């Protein structure tokens, strides 16, 4: 009896220790808080289905060496259910094994579960066969949501046991992408995910464009982005669009230059209350793809100076898109990734290459901005706890015109008599 009692006490003790060892993740208007300590994470986008599975561990380690502390990745629907009802989680589509690699390397993961992702994938990742169902995609159409629920259930089979509460790496997930309709649709996706079993510390959405109807406060943290250039621009001028604004320190968190091929012209406007969320990004241009009609070349300083500007403007999570390039996987029929579809305004993209001029290229090569950004990431690692609660102040003009170099571009983040000065002369 005594032995049984001791065994029960020992078992309960192990269970309590396991539960207690899971870090508590919360957030407030400034930052993420892990076990009571403020952090300024560095999040990198990498698409596991665009990298051979045998290379995942070495590539994740490269990201970690670059100062990355969180992995973000799309789960492309048409990569796993190209043919209706035939899910493929094998080889480089094996999400569960990728998550286990991230867990082994101590890196949390933010899953971007769609159903629409974009990611320069055909129809944004929505499989061709969906369009034959006669439903309205990216809406609360019951037929569409029936197939989305099946998708989410499949994703959950890969995630089950690897959620944050289980001691796993999956910390958060993003619903849809670059959506401008009613927040009711995003809330329907979240309700569906929770009903299936997703139970994560927080959930996200892209903060651009403005939603026609906002989601209730606290349901999804909006994440923002900016790029130095965009292949999606219809113009072939050297400096088209308003990308120059990404290099100005400013209070406005969002960008009106992202995905203009599908979103069109956008106002500089956030949904009411969004300023009360922490300022996080998920799509700082680590590089840029090239299309047939527009082939921008990105310099290492483009990514580096943009990151400095976002940090100096108050961001407490730098998320890059992309940080690691890749190669589009082979399809079972004809997985045409050239983007010649209405969903993305007929951009003519490479069939296989997705190098993105990223810090880590298509084959894992370390490009110059990998090393440049690493220095900034190490600064965030060492000083993030002090930096996170510091408000951003802008002594300079926030609307410096395109090509005007007569103004010093700088900002200050400070609190209680100490702070940091950020300068961008690029």
Where are these regions (language model features)?
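Aromatic-lined substrate-binding rim segments of carbohydrate-active enzymes
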Residues: 56-124, 128, 190-195
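Conserved residues at the C-terminal ends of beta-strands
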Residues: 45-47, 74, 176, 321-324
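Bacterial N-terminal signal peptides
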Residues: 7-17
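N-terminal carbohydrate-binding accessory modules
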Residues: 19-70, 100
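Carbohydrate-binding surfaces of carbohydrate-active enzymes
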Residues: 133, 144-158, 166-174, 180-190, ...
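Amphipathic, non-transmembrane alpha-helical secondary structure
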Residues: 53-65, 92-96, 100, 146-149, ...
């Amino acid at each position: 009896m005594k032995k049984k009692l001791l065994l029960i006490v020992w078992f309960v003790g192990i269970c309590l220790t396991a539960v207690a060892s899971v870090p508590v993740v919360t957030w407030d208007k400034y930052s993420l808080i892990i076990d009571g300590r403020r952090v300024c994470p560095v999040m990198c986008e990498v698409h596991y289905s665009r990298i051979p599975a045998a290379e995942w561990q070495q590539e994740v380690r490269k990201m970690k060496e670059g100062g990355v502390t969180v992995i973000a990745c799309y789960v492309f629907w048409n990569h796993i259910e190209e043919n209706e009802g035939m899910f493929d989680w094998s080889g480089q589509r094996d999400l569960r094994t990728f998550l286990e690699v991230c867990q082994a390397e101590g890196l949390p993961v933010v899953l971007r579960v769609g159903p629409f992702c974009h990611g320069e994938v055909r129809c944004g990742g929505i499989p061709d066969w969906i369009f034959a169902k006669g439903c309205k995609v990216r809406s609360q159409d019951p037929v569409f949501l029936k197939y989305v629920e099946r998708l989410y259930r499949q994703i959950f089979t890969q995630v089950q046991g690897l959620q944050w509460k289980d001691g796993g790496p999956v910390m958060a997930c993003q619903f849809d992408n670059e959506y401008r309709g009613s927040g009711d649709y995003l809330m329907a996706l979240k309700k569906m995910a929770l009903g299936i079993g997703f139970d994560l510390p927080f959930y996200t959405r892209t903060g651009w464009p403005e939603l026609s109807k906002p989601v209730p406060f606290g349901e999804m943290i909006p994440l923002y982005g900016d790029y130095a250039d965009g292949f999606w621009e219809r113009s072939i001028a050297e400096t088209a669009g308003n990308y120059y604004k990404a290099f100005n320190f400013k209070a406005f968190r969002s960008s009106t230059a992202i995905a203009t091929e599908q979103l069109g012209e956008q106002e500089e406007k956030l949904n009411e209350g969004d300023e009360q969320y922490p300022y996080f990004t998920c799509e700082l241009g680590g590089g840029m793809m090239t299309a047939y009609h527009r082939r921008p070349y990105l310099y290492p300083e483009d990514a580096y100076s943009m990151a400095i500007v976002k940090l100096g403007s108050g961001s407490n999570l730098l998320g890059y898109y992309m940080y690691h390039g890749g190669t589009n996987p082979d399809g079972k029929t004809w997985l045409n990734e050239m983007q010649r579809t209405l969903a993305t305004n007929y951009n003519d993209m490479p069939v296989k290459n997705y190098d993105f001029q990223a810090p880590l290229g298509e084959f894992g090569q370390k490009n110059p901005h990998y090393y440049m950004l690493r220095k900034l990431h190490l600064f965030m690692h060492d000083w993030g706890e002090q930096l996170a609660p510091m408000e951003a102040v802008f002594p300079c003009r926030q609307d410096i015109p395109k090509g005007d170099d007569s103004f010093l571009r700088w900002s200050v983040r400070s609190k209680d008599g100490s702070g940091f000065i950020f300068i961008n002369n690029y």
